Every structure is written in structure tokens, then in C-alpha cells.
Amino acid sequence: MEVVHAGEMPWGESLVAQRGGGTAVAHKRLFEGTEDSPDHYLLVMAREPNTYFSPRHRHPWDQVRFCLEGSIPIAKGVFVDGGEIAYFPESTHYGPQEGGEDRIVLLLQFGGASGQGFIGPDRMKQARLEMAKHGRFEDGVYKQDVVEGRRNRDAYEAIWLHVKGDVPTYAAPVYKTPVVMLPAALPWKVSHEANVSTREIGVFPHRGLSITSYRLAPGGSHVFPADTALRLLFVTAGTGHIEKHALGHWSSVRVNPGELATLHTDSGLEWMQLTVLPVAPEQA
């Protein structure tokens, strides 16, 4: 079990330089999994300006975006506003992304049900630098000056081809569009656990993903039993402790599969929790 305090971390370099955006795009790397695993994941905080552009595209993995501030464009006239959460399923098209407001976003990327995993930021940067010797990245597209063969390709697809030696395989999409959720529209429901209330925001069983908000009353405790799932917590209000670690606004917690932990608050605490089960063996 680990804790990081995103609000206190400095902004790092852009992890999506292949999409452009310059130095105005920045990221904070919170937690990540194991490269080449079908369960590989990356949790980051992202800062994007309203000038950021990404063409219509899709991924062979899954993504969740929690808009903390501003507004995220995900298609023409479609936005994820502050406090809203969007799920981008594997193989589902979205975009173009342009306009909206400057925003700060909590972003989780993780291997989809197809078991292909995803390429982590370090390997992606290495590939991008290697590919820059033979072409250029512009507006989310990799362009090559070649006599024969395909000249232009989606930036991420081009990197995937460079790293893995083949283009990504897209499973039949389970959803036509990304799913945008409005947590504030849901009532808090009293849990069977004393002093705990929840909002069950979204459950996506084909990938074992659940998105839930928790509210812990002053003086309350919450136990995370040992489980096969990965649990990622993001504190949205209040203060508390998980084991010996202090929690505050924008603290993030990783409870790994098999770990048990207890969270306690004296003054009250709210957090958003992403729970992800391992990719099923028959899928991987």
C-alpha cells in the first residue's frame, strides 16, 4: 500500500508529446504497473490547455478520466465538465479533442479485456525519440516522407507498430461512445459499514471496473479487506489516515491485490475509488 500527495508534487513533462501541446501539457505520475503485463496501468494527474488537440481515435486498452477542474472536450460539442467522470472503453472511438477549457484531470489508463495491455510512458518516449529520426509528429499524427507505403498514421498506432512490430488489434467495441457519468446527481447511500456512505457511479463488468465515491463520517473507519482487485483512491475532501499515512486533498492511495488496510478520519473524508480486477486468463 502506497500514498502520494498529488497536490504537493511538481508538474513533470508531458507524457503525450506525440499529440503535441507543447510545455503547457504536463503530468504527475502517481502510480503505474508492470510493462508487458496485460494488467499494466498508469494513474496520472494531467494538465491540458484548451489549445490541446487530438484527432478522432481509439485505443486497444481502457481509460477513465475524472475532470477535477475545467472541461474536457471528447467530441464535437461533447464535454466532461468539472466533477464528472468519463469511461473510454477499449476500441471505442472518441474525439476530436479541441477547445473546452484549461483543465486538470485524474487519468487512469489500463489494459483492456483483450489482454494486449498498453505501452507505458517510458517506452513510449523512447519510441517517439527513435521515430523522430525518420518522421515527425504533428497534431496527433505521425508523418513520414516515404516513397512507398503509408505516410500518415495515428501517433499512438504508429508508436504501437514501432514497439510491437504490428498495428494494434481492435476488439469489437462493447460501447458505441465513451460513457460520461455525473456523480453529483446520485444520492449518498448508507452502507452496511458504520459511518460510511457511497455513490455507486459506474460498474463495467466485462473489464472488472467499478467507480465508487465514498464518504466517511467524522470518527469513522473503513476497512479494505484483502482482495484480488487493484484499488486506487483519490481524496476529494477532508483529512484522515490510512495505516500510518496522512491523507488530505488530492492524496492518492494504491491498495495492491492481496493487501489489507484500514482508513480512519477524525473530521470526515471523501474519496473516489477505482477498482480494477485482473484481466481474466482466457482473455490474456
Mark where each language-model region is.
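Jelly-roll (double-stranded beta-helix
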Residues: M1-A284
